[in-house]
Amino acid sequence: MEKRLYASTPFGDIAYTERGSGPAALFVHGVFLNGNLWRPAIDRLSGVRRCIAVDLMAHGATRTRPDQDLSFDGQAAMLLAFCDALGLDQVDVVSNDSGTAIVQLFAARNPGRIRSLTLTNGDVHDNFPPPAAEPMMVAAKQGLIPEVGQRMLADLEDARAQFAVGYEHPERLSADTLRAYVEPLFSSPERTKEVERFILAIDCRSNVAVEPLLRRLMAPTLVVWGTGDIFFGIEWAHWLRDTIGGARRVIELPDAKLFFPEERPDELAAALREHWQYAECVGAGTAASA
């Protein structure tokens, strides 16, 4: 796993990677992954942005208290504290999977901190947990996450099979990539319990409640959506476009799956470069809700 830095916050020591210079861009992953998801895109973007990829609580190298609130509300509050700790007044935010739900909460409640917003396939409004995630939810409810984790640690092909549904080409995932995702999740019984608590805390009610705030959110917003995702259909990309006040458009990536930011970084990076240039032209530094 790429070497981590740490930001000390009231939520714990939040791990992150940082590359590049310029205005800050904050990249937020989802469940079962970590900031490594964004490495290929950051390779292409570090020349124009200070690219910061955070590890959510219960993921990657982030360290939190055993009683820490790991809900999406808690994660959104952590992002604000994380930005404060790094002295980031405004950020270009990019999200994926459950990170997309978390970022909607963060942006809706803190519009003045958002220079621009880019949302990719993920949890939206009341569409989660999606039916395709039911096996994960059942495993957490039945206390089976430790067993699942140990199988993945012992057999990387089992791990590949677990992640396969999110990738167009899971056969291309290297052993190092799989280890970088799996090992931090199940490195200890304590961390595995955190992962289980994160899953059990998944609840769409807060995201439903912030819809009025999203409608007033005027930060320039781009939606980039893979059409081959079995978790989150393209209709949710259109919902975001039609709901967020500053939303511009939807870019559809044919056949792309949930974790396309890792598999198709050229397309994502090109979309981000254009969107960031647009945001600069319209004075996104002053974007805030009405």
Range-by-range predicted roles:
Residues 1-13:
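N-terminal cap/lid segment of alpha/beta-hydrolase-fold proteins
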